[in-house]
């Protein structure tokens, strides 16, 4: 089958042919229709330090997808041939304390689709049926293919009560932008998002952010004054992994504020703990999506009118994958979709 794989331990990704994956007793075989390029895929493409330590070669990569069930393992119940599905990219062990305690997303033995095992940038993917999510008819393949990062946004945004609250999001990547859209949709008052990438800040405006702030040109304090905010933000979402952004967030939070952190700093990051302690801040680390509460929330948000279509900015046929990766790496895009049909 045709696939995109990390064939060599060097920058790049290659269109190649690999064997069709074998179906296990508890698995689904999925014919891939659409895939989306993730920031993780860019790390793997660039072959940075994280990728070198984490990703085996050769291996088919990718973990954001939508497809159709074309094979069902003999022990699987609840799926039929032709079902449209996306799927959870974190495969969990099922036997550790967190898995058995219903906190599956915190499994200590997680294996990543397209990171530690064969991924979805291929004509076919095999995953455990437990990880598949059946798609409602009104959710398009395009939208379903970005459910993985949308889930990161939803998990982060819904970690704390947002109704009537003022929200600060640092980092206007696709996940940060989708988190802004979720926050407005569920009833936040002001949603302010910061970055230095004007293309993506403009996308955030289209997705409903109250203010999208280029912090290289505009002061966050001035924006708060313009919005009539006198006490700081109630909820923060750190999506950038940039130490300066987190420092700014700590300074801008109201006493008793709550921060959800998804962005991963590139190295050790100094924190002014006096801000955390004297303001009584709560900081929560976010990893992946809650299985599968986040997935049902995602579908419900779209069914209730949340419009994510502006975040999908580019489409390419899989044969033109290099253009898609170049576009993602440029920073001048939202989500980039690769078509396998």
UniProtKB/Swiss-Prot annotation:
It comes from Colwellia psychrerythraea (strain 34H / ATCC BAA-681). One of its GO terms (molecular function) is zinc ion binding. Its cofactor is Zn(2+). Zn(2+) 1 binds at residues 38, 63-64. This is L-threonine 3-dehydrogenase. Its EC number is 1.1.1.103. Gene3D superfamilies: Medium-chain alcohol dehydrogenases, catalytic domain, NAD(P)-binding Rossmann-like Domain. Pfam families: ADH_N (PF08240), ADH_zinc_N (PF00107). One of its GO terms (cellular component) is cytoplasm. NAD(+) binds at residues 175, 195, 200, 262-264, 286-287. PANTHER family: L-THREONINE 3-DEHYDROGENASE (PTHR43401:SF2).
């Amino acid at each position: 089958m045709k696939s995109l794989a990390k064939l060599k331990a060097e920058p790049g990704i290659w269109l190649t042919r690999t064997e069709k994956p074998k179906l296990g007793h508890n698995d689904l075989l999925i014919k891939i229709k659409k895939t989306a390029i993730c920031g993780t895929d860019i790390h793997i493409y660039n072959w940075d330090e994280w990728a070198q330590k984490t990703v085996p070669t050769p291996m088919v990569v990718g973990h954001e997808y939508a497809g159709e069930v074309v094979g069902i393992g003999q022990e699987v119940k609840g799926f039929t041939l032709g079902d449209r599905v996306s799927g959870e990219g974190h495969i969990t062990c099922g036997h550790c304390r967190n898995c058995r305690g219903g906190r599956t997303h915190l499994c200590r033995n997680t294996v990543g689709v397209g990171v530690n095992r064969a991924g979805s940038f291929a004509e076919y993917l095999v995953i455990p049926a437990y990880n598949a999510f059946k798609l409602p008819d009104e959710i398009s393949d395009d939208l379903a293919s970005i459910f993985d990062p949308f889930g990161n946004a939803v998990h982060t945004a819904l970690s704390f009560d947002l109704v009537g609250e003022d929200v600060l999001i640092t980092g206007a990547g696709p996940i940060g932008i989708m988190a802004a859209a979720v926050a407005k949709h569920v009833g936040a008052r002001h949603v302010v998002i910061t970055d230095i990438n004007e293309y993506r800040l403009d996308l955030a405006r289209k997705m409903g952010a109250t203010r999208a702030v280029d912090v290289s040109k505009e002061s966050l304090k001035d924006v708060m004054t313009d919005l009539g905010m006198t006490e700081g933000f109630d909820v923060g979402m750190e999506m950038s992994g940039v130490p300066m952004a987190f420092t700014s967030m700590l300074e801008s939070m109201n006493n008793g504020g709550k921060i959800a952190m998804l962005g991963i700093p590139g190295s050790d990051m100094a924190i002014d703990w006096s801000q955390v302690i004297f303001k009584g801040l709560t900081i929560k680390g976010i990893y992946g999506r809650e299985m599968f509460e986040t997935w049902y929330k995602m579908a419900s948000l779209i069914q209730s009118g949340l419009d994510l279509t502006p975040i999908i900015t580019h489409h390419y046929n899989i044969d033109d994958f290099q253009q898609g990766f170049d576009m993602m790496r440029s920073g001048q895009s939202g989500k980039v979709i690769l078509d396998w049909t």
